[in-house]
Amino acid sequence: MALKYFNNRQLGILGDALDIAEDMTSNYFKLSVSQWKQHPFDVKTLSNSFGEDIKDNAFALLKKYMTVNKVEIEPLYKRREYYIICLQDHQILQALQRDRDLKLLPLLAYILTHELVHIVRFCKFQVRFETQKENSRTKEEKIVYQTTYEILRELSLPNLPYILGSYSPDRMNVDICRFD
């Protein structure tokens, strides 16, 4: 089966969803612009992904990287973590096709807010990215789900309450996020 990618209209909606997610997440955690810049991340879609970045059991894959250290230019202590949110277009589009009550903007706002909550928690050392034990990951997902719910519950977006109710950790049959 061929993978489905976001089209130009959907990419525009993705930009709007990212603006919402960044704004809501920074407000919740009370992050200033300079503090937010301390949590560097990027978003890529399926059209920029290949191989291990493509997953069939999640809406997004969160990857952690370290900036390249140029020994003669930059001391080791200046190396920084950054994150890439790899959206799984095909999984998101399939969910929209399967459930007519889902809409792209609120679903993407939810997914991106969820991922940003993970990033903030990792950067604030509230949890380690490298947590691999399934029970620890399940516990972390419940915390992130609850935080995402608190961030978005007052936001007025069509179909968002449906999404907030549908994607609780106890009801999910697809993961919002995988770590790699």
Q: Which residues fall in each region the model found?
A:
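Post-HEXXH active-site segment of zinc metalloproteases
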Residues: 93, 102-110, 121-150
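Long, well-structured alpha-helical subdomains associated
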Residues: 8, 12-19, 149, 153-180
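Short acidic, glycine/tyrosine-flanked loop/strand segments centered on an H-E-D-like triad
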Residues: 82-96, 113-128
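Long, hydrophobic, amphipathic alpha-helical segments used as structural scaffolds
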Residues: 29, 120-124, 155-159
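A generic structural signal for well-ordered alpha-helical segments enriched in polar/charged residues
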Residues: 23, 27, 118, 150-153
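A metal-dependent hydrolase signature that marks the N-terminal structural subdomain at the beginning
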Residues: 1-78
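Peripheral peptide segments
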Residues: 3, 34, 130-135, 162-170
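Active-site-adjacent loop/helix micro-motif of nuclease/hydrolase catalytic cores
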Residues: 54-55, 95-100
